[in-house]
Amino acid sequence: MTEDVMNDDFDSLVTKPTEFIDYNCDINNGFNDLLKSQKFDKLGFNYNVLSILGCQSSGKSSLLNSVFGLDFDVMNTKLGHSQTTKGLWGALVIPKDTGSGNVTIVIDVEGTDSRERGEGRLTFEHRSALLCLAISDCVVINLWYHSLGNLTGSNYGLLKTVVEANLELAEASENTLASGDYKTVLCFCIRDWFPELAPLETVRQKVVNEYMLGIWNDINKPDKFKNSKLEDIFRFELYGFNHALVHPDEFAKDSSRFRLAWATSISPKSYSRAVPSDGFFYYASNILQTVKDQSHLDIPNQREMLANFRCQEIKGGVLDEMVPSISSMLTDAQSGVMDDFQHRAVELVDVAVGKYLELASRYDKTTSNKIGNELVISVFSKLQPVFDAIISHHCSDLAVRATVRLNEKFAISGKERSPMVGGQKAADVWPKFNMLTDEIKAELYNSLNSHILSCAINYSHESGIQAQSDFDTSAAVDMFNVTFKNEVESVRARHIRALLGQITDLVDSGFKVIGEALLERNVTSDKYWGDVNDLIDRAYSTCLDTMGPCYTGLVPSVQPNEFEYLAFMILLQATKCNLERTESRITDIILERFEQFFQYQEFNGETVPRDWGSYTEEELKQTYTQCKKEALNIVAVLRDCSPPTLEVPAFEVSSLKPNHVLYQELSAGVDSLRATTTSLSDEVLVDTVKACRKRFQEFFRTAQQIQSSSKNGISWKNIPPPFWILLLLCSWNELCSVLRIVFKVQVLIPLIILGFIVVQYFSHLVFGTSADAVFRPFKRQARELAMVGTKWIFKVATSTAAAAVNAGAKTTFLSDDDNDSGKKAEEN
């Protein structure tokens, strides 16, 4: 205690006097600093307050200095009489032995009847008297013995002010007078007295029975005190003090006697105003401000205000202390390692309430419990981020569970035309899609709600403090809804694509049949495009009958005619894609038609290959020209587009919301799909004819070769000698390669020869001459096979030579005929 003044003559420590109330009747915060420096706020109710009232220059400060060993400023009489103490000053008297008594706040009050104060002295005297009576366990009245009997010198006016002020305090209190809560101790200290003048009992009778009782009878008392006695309001004590200068030793003994009486009998065991030490300064400040503003006091209201102020302060301090623990919990929650949130939260609240009650329990219980409830609610509020982190992890787990459940329930398997969803037919599952997803959502939401309830806290403390957690779950619910919706939308989109794929497949499968019709000889524009429109009509009817309920189940909030319009769009789109695909392979179609018409013919209702050997050269040319013309006719069929005859369903695309799952597809419209243009332009047609010309010629030349071979027969004699020389020269490398391979087989050939000799030798050895009869047929067959192979080789060579001879003669016909075909194709 740096400001303590050691006093060997006393068993206590004291502080230097500090201004409490300044000359303008304003409280000084420096006094609060003094209290804090001495850890006064830790005392609880174990302290007392003593103040002294009396006339100016009556020796109040010197009396307090003598009794408690303090160092209040005193008047120097050698310099004349003047005002020394201005305002109120205070000091602490602290027992050296903490168990020997309470700490005492000693307040030295500016003297009354001050000439320096002038006309404002009465106001200050009233305010200071009210303040001292409100905050003091004991008010010392300093009187001079020789002034007893005088009106002014005996402080009669001051005593009257004290009585009236104390009545005002008692009237404002809700406590009964008999309880003793507001029985302020009035201790009269009679100065310059010694026993030879008059016994103290006589002086007591004079002061109490004449002065105080006279004042009691003269003042106007409130109705509740009409029948009350003076002793119901005050407790009187009286002590005599010898002359300090004439009899200093006796004065010192009298001071010691009063100090002992204060410590043993006068001072209460605890502060009688029931204000904890940490709230004393604020209580005194509020009392002074109320006296200045209203000139009267409402003590219970002041206590309630003090309790509310201090408890709020304590609550704020406790919340600050809880921040590290809450941060630690938040870290654990964010890392996903907290499984005991409720237990840890209750422990945290218990610690907070314990710290709070350590100080707040000294104040009004109703107020402290009310703010204690607020403390618990504030702790719950600070735990909101922890709660959010825990629920966020649980929502992530629920998202995984949602994905698993949705994939199990809506797994697509099977063929495209008859898909299975979750082991059931898609047509049975899709109409109930929204209902099934709602069931899964309800199951997962129940899990979320159970987890939220497991984190709820209904806190109750033995002190009466209780509160229930009210964590904001809106963020958790929103997170769950968004997460589940995203999972559902992903599955929904996948199944809608599967449904649209089925609609498209209706057209694709139909075009496979229509594509076969393009190879027919008698195909026409009316027949082809009629088949296309019939396919669209059938597919559209099938969509409405079997897929409408599926679409309604998959897509929420379906507008009237929405599916009809969408199905029409998908069918047109699929039709357009198939037509474009057909047009892109026009060259292959033409070649397939030509090959089918040119290479095959109808015979007895069956398609058989043509026997070109039976055709004359003119018939071959006519057949070639006719087949080429029929093959190219398909171009005119494809170019003669016919728009769909199906009427477009009436549907307002503007009625769709932008968040519709198929908004982009439906917004495209059908106008572009109903266009009658074709990609087979004149330029494309010319390129197509050029690409087909070479293949046509190859087919024709092959037919000519077969025809020539059939007419000329196969004979090596018909082949001119120069051809043999040319053949020998061209195939010389191949012959050498064959010979090298044969001669390289140096082991196989000897083995074959050796095997033949061994078999023949042993056969003759065993069977004799009859063995020749057995081997002769095998030798004859081997020679025949060799001759057949040789004849076949000569036949192929002869045919090749004949074709080469006749090729030049036919080139002019093919060239002229192809030019005519190109012109006809361009006209088509």
UniProtKB/Swiss-Prot annotation:
Residues that bind GTP: 54-61
Subcellular location(s) of the protein: Endoplasmic reticulum membrane
GO biological process, one term: endoplasmic reticulum membrane fusion
Cytoplasmic side: 1-718, 764-828
Entry keyword set: Endoplasmic reticulum, GTP-binding, Hydrolase, Membrane, Nucleotide-binding, Transmembrane, Transmembrane helix
Coiled coil ranges: none
InterPro entries: G_GB1_RHD3_dom, P-loop_NTPase, RHD3/Sey1, Sey1/RHD3-like_3HB
Zinc-finger as UniProt keyword: no
Lumenal topological domain: 740-742
This enzyme's EC code(s): 3.6.5.-
Membrane topology: Multi-pass membrane protein
One GO term describing the cellular component: endoplasmic reticulum membrane
Molecular function GO terms recorded: GTP binding; GTPase activity
Record flagged with keyword Endoplasmic reticulum: yes
Stretches that traverse the bilayer: 719-739, 743-763
Domain GB1/RHD3-type G: 44-284
Family that this chain belongs to: Belongs to the TRAFAC class dynamin-like GTPase superfamily. GB1/RHD3 GTPase family. RHD3 subfamily.
Job of this protein: Probable GTP-binding protein that may be involved in cell development.
Protein name: Protein SEY1 homolog
Organism listed in the record: Babesia bovis
